[in-house]
């Protein structure tokens, strides 16, 4: 052991402390950097005593606990007088500095602490610690701490690197000290004091000691710990991680909780605040460090909640606190980008877990979303929006409100993990499959927190054999199948699951052992052992949050995947809005009507919505039998519910709000049930369901035309019942809810039946048949080379493109082939947009009326892309005066006015999300203006009138192409039909109507020819 008096005259060879095994290289590094022997003694990070460097670990383990510590009076913690004399910088250890340095800020010190400060300056200062920097306050706190012994790592090499870097900056530090005044009363900042003490404390514990496990952190910062260097007053601080620092910085300073949380790092900790060369700054930090360290160690040792920041006894004025700036915040975190130390693995493994924060200090209260990842921010915005609405909160009982409160009381990592799991499908998940490194490297404590709070279930509650089997992978199932000697242990996963479920239902042969578990219990036990630890979010809390999300996004159609995976689409919308990447039109939210009468009404609606989602998912996957069983179950539920007294009030709701009732959802399910039965060729059952749907007029009246049309087809084509078919057609044509294409379809079927010889005896039934005349339009035919292909996919054609000197062959659709034909015919401009072309012009010309104020209940939340009554008759009736006036203006407007109106809306609203407007439909505003100039007022006015009067039934069937000549303003509206394609009834009606309005329309038929034929004729 080295002599404690002074360093040896001649340094003996010693073992390198570096990780590297190249002793020569390590020795050269130390000699070149220090040019003398390393210090014989180091300061103990606990008691600040000078200890021989090689006895530091033994001192901490055996001797340090028995030493006396300097007791600090908490009342003395405060600011120091500014007239403290300067201290020679040579007495301060030279350490690492960052390449970029900023002048230190002026520090105003209070006059009440000058004497004590001067006394402390005279104390001995070690090369790495000031002797008066007390880390533990009393003996009891020390005894409660557990100090682990870890390797010193590459301490010598690190110190040498710091020495070289710091030596280069010493002159600049002295210049900073000479240029900064000794007193300034205008720049005292609270973050300077708080962060100076806290960061300095962590600096001394983490950097200058090899005992890097003596670091305490906020429980909400269970992130990956990657050390980084920060400079403050010629002291080096290795932060736990930049990610953890950023998390604590943002969470600890959220407006709603800044008074209740201890700040580890302030956003105003910038490098221009860190380079301090005067002893005044050091004394301030020494004085302020004591109280903060005391609190942090008390939190760890006693396992208690964090106390409010007011107990820190550091008082500053409001003006000083307000001196923080966002610019400083940005510069701080852009400059702190240091590389991790070589032995940071030890640090990652040895940092202890600290206590969870209370709601007041968890930084996760309602609306406080700054610093959270995108998914948690979106989730908190949804919660805040619904919780702030009194009508919505009446739909939750006290227990459910308590669940939301518990969520806010979770730590930040707990909230993150729960939202991640909430967005996944509701099923059991193996612990080994849970990997969210951005939340925590070790999710075990987070899962334990969620389990204790009642948000997660563990495998101890997994008792359903089918769920366990679904949890197993295919190899695991095969292994289990071999254990139970199944007939086909190497079969597909679903086959093995079915085989196990069948085996579990068999009765045991050994009937004498009544206490023996059945075969199902044995399979369950073996399967659970094979699956290992697993978790699933609890259904109760998940249902509460699902209903909250449902209320938030009630006006959006809930997609199948969203219903199964926690509304990912809605959360993504919230995120994009918060990021400024999505903006909705400006309108006034006006909620007058209560859609849900009580909590039970909302629960029934949510259950029906999820049932519809499950059925739609089964249909999309082709599982028709499964979809049939689900639909039958839903039908039974609806039959028990449809006469409930609470449903009678649904009839009084306007149609655009009635679609958010449980009866509407079950009616949609029964309509899907008809499709399922028809796919399974069960036409008798389908007819009965259609007749049942048509017997009521409360729910889904906009679907009545489709139901009548399908009923007539089933009776006529599949069941060959002519008389019921004719009666069905007659009743359907008399129904005012049967519109446009469906009405024309029923009429044409009636005409075919009337002319059929087999229906002569039913001619008397056609006497009341109303006449419908649809004018035919021009038809042209072109040819194209069809690309050979298999299956029923869309036709693909081969077309010659490019210049005549350099032709190229391309594959194209039938519409692109038609565009090429019209381009050669003199139409230099063309758009293939179908209905979106006209709906975009409709939205641009009537934007202000579509989103006008004064109509109750059509705008109910902040993320609507259209008014709720857009697809109902009430849209036109409630805006009739404004619409009639605008349509007349459009009809009579000259070309310049049309162009100006389109330009005005384009410039004011471009990019905003509106369901009617596709901003990418036109290549530019100029193209949109050119098109309205060609179409003219009468055509535009007529199209807009039809869309405004019945958007639900008129949005489909518009022509595929709009082509025009930019010079002559000559245009055509073209419907393109490929091989084996024909016009739909809606397309026939639109073509005839556009022709009446004065537009030149035609149908372009594309005939396929052989590959060796010409591309176009």
Curated annotation (Swiss-Prot):
In terms of superkingdom, the source organism counts as: Eukaryota
Per the UniProt entry, what are the Gene Ontology biological process annotations, in alphabetical order? DNA repair; double-strand break repair via homologous recombination; interstrand cross-link repair; nucleotide-excision repair
Where is the short sequence motif D-box located? 14-22
| Record's disease association | Interstitial nephritis, karyomegalic: A rare kidney disease characterized by chronic tubulointerstitial nephritis associated with massively enlarged tubular epithelial cell nuclei. The clinical picture is associated with recurrent upper respiratory tract infections in addition to chronic kidney disease beginning in the third decade of life. Schizophrenia and autism. Schizophrenia is a severe psychiatric disorder characterized by positive, negative, and cognitive symptoms, and it is associated with increased mortality and severely reduced fecundity. Autim is a complex multifactorial, pervasive developmental disorder characterized by impairments in reciprocal social interaction and communication, restricted and stereotyped patterns of interests and activities, and the presence of developmental abnormalities by 3 years of age. Most individuals with autism also manifest moderate intellectual disability.
Q: What is the organism field in this record?
A: Homo sapiens
Query: Where can this protein be found?
Result: Nucleus
- Residue ranges of coiled coil: 671-696
Q: Where is the composition biased (Basic residues)?
A: 11-23
Q: What is this protein called?
A: Fanconi-associated nuclease 1
The encoding gene is: FAN1
The domain comment in this protein's record states:
The UBZ4-type zinc finger specifically binds monoubiquitinated FANCD2.
